[in-house]
Regions:
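N-terminal subdomain of nucleotide-sugar transferases
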Residues: 1-40, 67, 127
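Short N-terminal targeting/anchoring amphipathic segment
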Residues: 5, 62-79, 91
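Histidine-centered beta-alpha loop that forms part of the nucleotide-sugar donor binding/catalytic region
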Residues: 8, 75, 94-97, 150-151
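A short, charged, and often flexible helix/loop element on the N-terminal side
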Residues: 37-64, 103-110
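Active-site proximal beta-strand in glycosyltransferases
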Residues: 70-73, 86-103, 129
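Membrane-proximal helix-turn-helix segments that form the acceptor-binding/catalytic region
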Residues: 109-128
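Carbohydrate-associated surface elements
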Residues: 131-134, 152
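Acidic anion/phosphate-binding donor-loop and adjacent secondary structure
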Residues: 140-141, 152-155
Length: 155
């Protein structure tokens, strides 16, 4: 299979980065072709409050030239616009409750804007997965069909 992973980050010790690297390694061992779009290979503005929006735009533009994927797997809401722009079945994995995280980090105005975008992003996915029971409860209470898949660890 030809699979595109879209993630705000793919390196470092953070949870999303570790998950994406583990998923990539597993999928490649099973003879899949994997391509990753992340902040490491797109343009981002490294300023608080601008990194995610700049990643959203640059990853969206990058997918204009990337087609013919069987699966497009976006990690977290900032990756959803690029996912929407790509060909293939669309999986959106949400690592936490995005709009609440933005509200806590950047304030109520940004949180409210994020909540509206989050609603759009969820509608673009063929499948929505979450990693926690809290996220599962939250998104199902909003009426979305969600699958909970806890992050795996390599031991």
């Amino acid at each position: 299979m030809n699979i595109l992973l879209i993630s705000p980050t793919q390196s470092g010790i953070g949870g999303i980065a570790q998950h994406v690297q583990g998923l990539k390694n597993f999928l490649e061992k099973n003879e899949n072709s994997i391509e990753i779009i992340s902040s490491e290979n797109t343009f981002t503005i490294p300023v608080k409050g601008l990194k995610n929006p700049s990643f959203m735009i640059s990853s969206f533009l990058k997918t204009k030239f990337k087609k013919n994927f069987d699966i497009v797997h976006a990690h977290n809401i900032p990756s959803a616009l690029a996912m929407k722009n790509s060909s293939g079945k669309k999986i959106l994995t949400i690592h936490g409750i995005f709009s609440e995280q933005i509200n806590q980090l950047h304030g109520k105005t940004s949180g409210n804007i994020s909540k509206k975008y989050e609603k759009d992003a969820l509608s673009w996915a063929d499948v929505i997965t979450v990693i926690s029971k809290e996220s599962y409860d939250y998104y199902t209470s909003l009426g979305y069909k969600v699958i909970q898949i806890p992050n795996a660890i390599d031991i």
